[in-house]
Curated annotation (Swiss-Prot):
Identification of the protein by name: Pesticidal crystal protein Cry4Aa
Keywords annotated in UniProt: Plasmid, Sporulation, Toxin, Virulence
A Pfam family this chain is assigned to: Cry1Ac_dom-VII
Keyword RNA-binding: no
Biological role: Promotes colloidosmotic lysis by binding to the midgut epithelial cells of insects.
Example of a GO MF term: toxin activity
Highest classification ranks of the organism: Bacteria, Bacillati, Bacillota, Bacilli, Bacillales
Family the entry assigns: Belongs to the delta endotoxin family.
Coiled-coil intervals: none
An example Gene Ontology biological process: sporulation resulting in formation of a cellular spore
Cross-referenced Gene3D superfamilies: Galactose-binding domain-like (2.60.120.260), Pesticidal crystal protein, central domain (2.100.10.10), Pesticidal crystal protein, N-terminal domain (1.20.190.10)
Length: 1180
């Protein structure tokens, strides 16, 4: 009876602790032979013997599991991964050295391992080099044994008895080991042949040894920092002798991490390039892809996997244990003997036999098609993979690889959740008997769930084979060395394996004896299928473990030191995690690289169910657009400031979105990290916060007595520093917080006193400023501290645009001669806001368009206590370092106008010449919006003294000053001329200088002409704002008032109502085709037909004489007339003909016999134009 037909047994396998299950979606027994019994031994010696003595096929299996050096690599990486999971200060060193010493320095032959490291690389590349160099390299490396062993023994002694002497011994040994590697590693690199190409090859050969030595050095430096910090916190060790402390070791550690990382990756890539550029003589001068892949696979396990863990040694970034994962894939190859290079170029082989960068996948099933035949020697023709993304329940199907025919039969091996293949045997027909592409006949799969072993198989046809076969074992060595095993097998076991099968690809070779080349892709067993967020460790989750990716985002190849690929983040991606402790709080941060500038910083948001949305702007980390060779320093960490406590849900979705508009800004996401917040971490963060604020405020001052601020320090910087002070814990640091608050208040007062601009922070509303109506002072935006200026768009009234503006003139008395002043401020957001700063004529004219990309940093609403900035993601914007972001919007003296995009902070300069308090030129600062859809929020506006000018700047300002004086002289002359003419015309209107009465013969035309002359006076209004007074505004107002007086007197003495037709035909009786038209700015009554008539009845004083005065013109044939008639039918008539050119004035004296008269206007033919009609009493 087959043991797996028992339902309860199958369910027992399903209830896995870590890994193994068979999916119900597939045939449980897709093969003819029953599966073998479960093998529960951890020693595979018996299993190997069974394979090698297989009676059906005969012969031995060729193993792809290297002994010696490859197992050493996987064990070292496994040991380091395990060591980082320990949170005790000495965990990594004690566990690490206890495992690494017997691996790197085996007791039976201490020189073997280092020699094997070098030999295995030499066997891949196969280039000659003098053996003396290799021998010397081994000697250099083996000198490390005694140093490391002595240090390890002292550590164990101290652990058992941490007395002062043992403590001092450990400190001494740390220093000795550090000095040793400081000398040995450079010596290893520098002991190369003198020829540059031979030197490069030598360094490629010793690279794996270099990486192992670097790892030992970093382990010691990491331990040094932790050990010294431990001693500092235990004051009974205060009397120890002076030696380097954690403060001394930490910068050495971080520099070593960077240097070792960059060197390893650079040298590794040199090896790849050497293979790609070195033709293989055995392949007719072509490039050998198999050699390339073998080098890549072995150097990944030997070097890159280890290098990817180097950042974890940084105690500052990882103060507690860390859970890391390696998501890269490596490949083992079957059937490469029938040379593919004859048919395909190198790149085609690479694309066909490896997977392109992709989200991390988990194998769901392997599905092979067997040839439709009943005879012996059957084989698989083609196959496809089913897989899923991490914590995604949707299974994806790969392409079908091979030569599939519709008659082929499908056989599948299904894998349920948490079941993995860690080893497989492959039996394939010998190539010379093949008549079709595929040649695998049988595969045995060794499967684990972490607690038990299951073997399954896929067999083509009946399994009967009469031909010769090839037998191969695929897999990778164990992950951990167990000290109680003595000399354990290197073959993986169900509970000690370093890799699992993730994918199978193949490439058909159209050779005489047709062959299918297979690659088996393996991923590291450190990858967690559940994305578990740990409560006691810093959890690293690679970004490629996302299960959803936006259409614009993609996965790109990693630089070699990240342990896997990266997400090129353009729109969004989602990661699903699991978490069980709902009381634990976390900080979340990302490790990333970005080429954004200070003005085009990418902005990301993080959405988590049950958690307020998080957001932050990413600082640029590298320049340029090439991200294929990024160095260690090109990746940085950035943390969301909010603490996060996950909702009670086992699966948690984290959705990352980009909310900026800078699509050309590259953002590469490496990892998402979760830092559990403990009391010690919180206290450490508060201490760091305090020290950071203290350092920031200490940079404010230009002298020790702190009475002068640094010129580059902005008022906005001080406000933000005040916010940081407010966020310091009063519980932990009440005294320090109060002292810092006094410091920042002092800085604010100094900032205000040096600002020659009044009320630049708008704390006194608009005091000192002149504004339009649609200006408001608000305090509801946490981007600013306190009040800020809000400008709405220009008003559009019936097609007329009325700009929004605010300006201030700095009086001459506040300025110094021949001095440069900084004009700067902060823009929360704006569109089409124009900044004009002028003394001698628009020295600064800038349009500022700044996106509202800071809102993600702050909550959108205030509570009764205001905005809680301490729970936001706000990061101080380079306080004290303004060379980058703060002054990126600057004026170019070579341009008259500047358009500033994106920069929130602006800074310009303006220079003064000689001062003249009588002229009071001053400095004008103005903000203006001329478009209805414009807007702006501004604050922290400053004009401060930078210093005296000299040299070219002094010459330039003197030139500008002279030019301005010349222009002003010309303007004054022009003004005086216009003023004199206008004044003379106005004086002629009146009978006396008091303007009490008009001259009797003053006409409307004369008044209108005088008004025209007044309107012609130049420079009445500001050059930039049409309703703001200019240099001639006062004289204009004076003359305009006299014209208004004349007009008033004119209207008062005219007995006829609306005699100038400015109110249309109001007061007149109209018949026929007559109306009032605007002609050359004057209201004119127009009669266009003989049938039209206009009349008005007027009441007069009896027995008074009157003058009837008409200004009119006639066009065309006929006459135009104005008739005055009294009730006694006495009349006077003024007649106009077209013979009289233009408008003429005609008068007639009338002496009505009655107190009522009628004024009638008409014409006989053509058109008649009347500009004004007056009836004036002769007594006026």
């Amino acid at each position: 009876m087959n043991p797996y037909q028992n339902k309860n047994e199958y369910e027992t396998l399903n209830a896995s602790q870590k890994k193994l299950n068979i999916s119900n979606n597939y045939t449980r027994y897709p093969i003819e032979n029953s599966p073998k019994q479960l093998l529960q031994s951890t020693n595979y010696k018996d299993w190997l013997n069974m394979c090698q003595q297989n009676q059906q096929y005969g012969g031995d299996f060729e193993t792809f599991i290297d002994s010696g050096e490859l197992s050493a690599y996987t064990i070292v990486v496994g040991t380091v991964l395990t060591g980082f999971g320990f949170t005790t200060p000495l965990g990594l060193a004690l566990i690490g050295f206890g495992t690494l010493i017997p691996v790197l320095f085996p007791a039976q032959d201490q020189s073997n391992t280092w020699s094997d490291f070098i030999t295995q690389t030499k066997n891949i590349i196969k280039k000659e080099i003098a053996s003396t160099y290799i021998s010397n390299a081994n000697k250099i490396l083996n000198r490390s044994f005694n140093v490391i062993s002595t240090y390890h023994n002292h550590l164990k002694t101290w652990e058992n008895n941490p007395n002062p002497q043992n403590t001092q011994d450990v400190r001494t040994q740390i220093q000795l080991v550090h000095y040793h590697f400081q000398n040995v590693i450079p010596e290893l690199v520098n002991s190369c042949p003198p020829n540059p190409s031979d030197c490069d090859y030598y360094n490629i050969l010793v690279l794996s040894s270099y990486a192992q030595a670097a790892n030992l050095h970093l382990t010691v430096l990491n331990q040094a920092v932790k050990f010294e910090a431990y001693l500092k916190n235990n004051r009974q060790f205060d009397y120890l002798e002076p030696l380097p402390t954690a403060i001394d070791y930490y910068p050495v550690l971080t520099k070593a991490i960077e240097d070792y990382t960059n060197y390893c990756v650079t040298t590794y890539k040199k090896g790849l390039n050497l293979i790609k550029t070195t033709p293989d003589s055995n392949l007719d001068g072509n490039i050998n892809w198999n050699t390339y892949n073998t080098y890549r696979t072995k150097m990944t396990t030997a070097v890159l996997d280890l290098v990817a863990l180097f950042p974890n040694y940084d105690v500052g970034k990882y103060p507690i244990g860390v859970q890391s994962e390696l998501t890269r894939e490596i490949y083992q190859v079957l059937n490469f003997e029938e040379s593919p290079y004859k048919y395909y170029d190198f790149q085609y082989q690479e694309d066909s036999l490896t997977r392109r960068p992709h989200l991390f996948t988990w194998l769901d099933s392997l599905n092979f098609y067997e040839k439709a035949q009943t005879t012996p020697n059957n084989f698989f023709t083609s196959h496809y993979n089913m897989f899923h993304y991490t914590l995604d329940n949707i299974s994806q199907k790969s392409s079908v690889f091979g030569n599939h025919n519709v008659t082929d039969k499908l056989k599948s091996l299904g894998l349920a959740t948490n079941i993995y293949i860690f080893l497989l045997n492959v039996i394939s027909l010998d190539n010379k008997y093949l008549n079709d592409y595929n040649n695998i006949s049988k595969m045995d799969f060794f499967i684990t769930n972490g607690t038990r072993l299951l073997e399954k198989e896929l067999t083509a046809g009946s399994g009967q084979i009469t031909y010769d076969v090839n037998k191969n074992i695929f897999g990778l060595p164990i992950l951990k060395r167990r000290e109680n095993q003595g000399n354990p097998t290197l073959f993986p076991t169900y509970d000690n394996y370093s890799h699992i099968l993730s994918f199978i690809k193949s490439l058909s070779i159209p050779a005489t004896y047709k062959t299918q080349v297979y690659t088996f892709a393996w991923t590291h067993s450190s990858v967690d299928p559940k994305n578990t967020i740990y409560t006691h460790l810093t959890t690293q989750i690679p970004a490629v473990k996302a299960n959803s990716l936006g259409t614009a985002s993609k996965v790109v190849q990693g630089p070699g030191h990240t342990g896997g690929d990266l997400i090129d983040f353009k729109d969004h991606f989602k990661i699903t995690c699991q978490h069980s402790n709902f009381q634990q709080s976390y900080f979340i941060r990302i490790r990333y690289a970005s080429n954004g500038s200070a003005n085009t910083r990418a902005v990301i948001n993080l959405s988590i169910p049950g958690v307020a949305e998080l957001g932050m702007a990413l600082n640029p980390t590298f320049s340029g657009t090439d991200y294929t060779n990024l160095k260690y320093k090109d990746f940085q960490y950035l943390e969301f400031s909010n603490e996060v406590k996950f909702a009670p849900n086992q699966n948690i979705s984290l959705v990352f979105n980009r909310s900026d508009v800078y699509t050309n800004t590259t953002v590469l996401i490496d990892k998402i990290e979760f830092l559990p917040i403990t009391r010690s971490i919180r206290e450490d963060r508060e201490k760091q916060k305090l020290e950071t604020v203290q350092q920031i405020i200490n940079t404010f001052y230009a002298n020790p007595i702190k009475n002068t601020l640094q010129s580059e320090l902005t008022d906005y910087d001080i406000d933000q520093a005040a916010n940081l002070v407010e966020c310091i814990s009063e519980e932990l640091y009440p005294k320090e917080k109060m002292l810092l608050l006094d410091e920042v208040k002092n800085a604010k007062q100094l900032s205000q006193s040096r600002n020659v601009l009044q009320n630049g922070d708008f704390e006194s509303a608009t005091l000192g400023w002149t504004t339009s109506d649609n200006i408001t002072i608000q305090e509801d935006d946490p981007i600013f501290k306190g009040h800020y200026l809000h400008m709405s768009g220009a008003r559009d009234i019936d097609g007329t645009i009325f700009p929004t503006y605010i300006f201030q003139k700095i009086d001459e008395s506040k300025l110094k001669p021949y001095t440069r002043y900084l004009v700067r401020g902060f823009v929360g957001s704006s569109k089409d806001v124009e900044l004009v700063v002028s003394r001698y004529g628009e020295e600064i004219d800038a349009i500022m368009n700044v996106p509202a990309d800071l809102n993600y940093l702050y909550p959108s609403t205030f509570d009764c206590e205001g905005s809680n900035r301490c729970e936001t993601s706000a990061v101080p914007a380079n306080i004290g370092n303004t060379s980058d972001m703060l002054y990126s919007c600057q004026y170019d003296t070579g341009k008259k106008h500047v358009v500033c995009q994106d920069s929130h902070q602006f800074s310009f300069t303006i220079d003064t010449g000689a001062l003249d308090t009588n002229e009071n030129i001053g400095v004008w600062v103005m903000f203006k919006i001329s478009s209805p859809d414009g807007y702006a929020s501004l604050d922290n506006l400053e004009v401060i003294e930078e210093g005296p000018i000299d040299g070219e700047a002094l010459s330039r300002v003197k030139h500008m000053e002279k030019k301005w004086n010349d222009q002003m002289e010309a303007k004054r002359s022009e003004t005086q001329q216009a003023y004199d003419v206008a004044k003379q015309a106005i004086d002629a209107l009146f009978t006396n200088v008091q303007d009490e009465a008009l001259q009797f013969d003053t006409t409307l035309a004369q008044i209108q002409y005088a008004e025209y002359l007044v309107q012609s006076i130049p420079y009445v209004y500001n050059d930039w704002l049409s309703d703001v007074p200019g240099m001639n505004y006062d004289i204009y107002v004076e003359l305009d008032a006299r014209v208004a007086q004349a007009r008033y007197l004119y209207d008062t003495r005219n007995i006829i109502k609306n005699g100038d037709f400015t109110q249309g035909v109001m007061g007149w009786h109209v018949t026929g085709n007559a109306d009032v038209q605007q002609i050359d700015g004057v209201s004119v009554l127009v009669l266009s037909n003989w049938s039209a008539g206009v009349s008005q009845n007027v009441h007069l004083q009896h027995n008074h004489g009157y003058v009837l005065r008409v200004i009119a013109k006639k066009e065309g044939p006929g006459n135009g007339y104005v008739t005055l008639m009294d009730c006694e039918e006495n009349q006077e008539k003024l007649t106009f003909t077209s013979c009289e050119e233009g408008y003429i004035t005609k008068t007639v004296d009338v002496f009505p016999d009655t107190d009522r008269v009628r004024i009638e206007i008409g014409e006989t033919e053509g058109s008649f134009y009347i500009e004004s009609i007056e009836l004036i009493c002769m007594n006026e």
